[in-house]
Amino acid sequence: MSKRLQSANVHFNESGTPVADSFDDVYFSNESGCDETRHVFINGNDLTERWLNWQSAHFIIAETGFGTGLNCIIAMQQFKQFRAANPAHPLKRLFILSTEKFPLAVADLQHALAVFPSVSEEVHALAERYPPALSGCHRMNFDAWHTSIDLWLGDVHELLPQWHCPLDGLVDAWFLDGFAPSKNPQMWTEALFTQMARLSKT
């Protein structure tokens, strides 16, 4: 049975950047949040090149900290551009599996992402589909972006062991985004890395 979760306690600093009170850490840089995400997660996983060479119909990204959803939004946007440029490509859909223990209230999420006009369409779509703070899996379909997001709300250490993994693996790429290890060491443990290894395609 689903249970109601504690929402994230956040404040916005003098620069308008969202800060997680529980971890005393920012969600992203206001000046370069989108560029940071593209550099660390999109380019860091070489996603555009991998998509071009992908022969399956779907690609699966798993993320260990949904936060404001910015990483998912940027990935959606990039995948939409990929599909528009390559309409006949065999890769048709992006699936993102993301976890979050302390979900933001939708108003805080919208406030946080309002500084990035380049993703305003994606933010609006996410806000329309954003689930209540109840434990479990919440699927959000974004058909215009050829993307589905399964947002798993709860403790990542309890959630990942629940994920069924085919013999050849489940996850094609990982977004590790759980605040700095010094601020949130629970998101950077050996047990978590063991689960990631279990779920990853080889």
Regions found by a protein language model. Give the residues of each.
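Rossmann-like AdoMet
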Residues: 1-62, 76-118
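A generic structural signal for short coil/turn motifs at secondary-structure boundaries
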Residues: 26-28, 161, 182-185
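Glycine-rich phosphate-binding loop signature in dinucleotide/nucleotide-binding domains
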Residues: 55, 165-169
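Conserved glycine-centered beta->alpha loop in an early N-terminal alpha/beta scaffold
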Residues: 65
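Glycine-rich SAM-binding Motif I of class I
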Residues: 68-73
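S-adenosyl-L-methionine
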Residues: 108-166
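A short SAM/SAH-binding and catalytic strip from SAM-dependent methyltransferases
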Residues: 156-157, 171-187
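A short glycine-rich, Lys/Arg-flanked "PGG" loop and its adjoining helix->strand segment in the class I
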Residues: 186-202
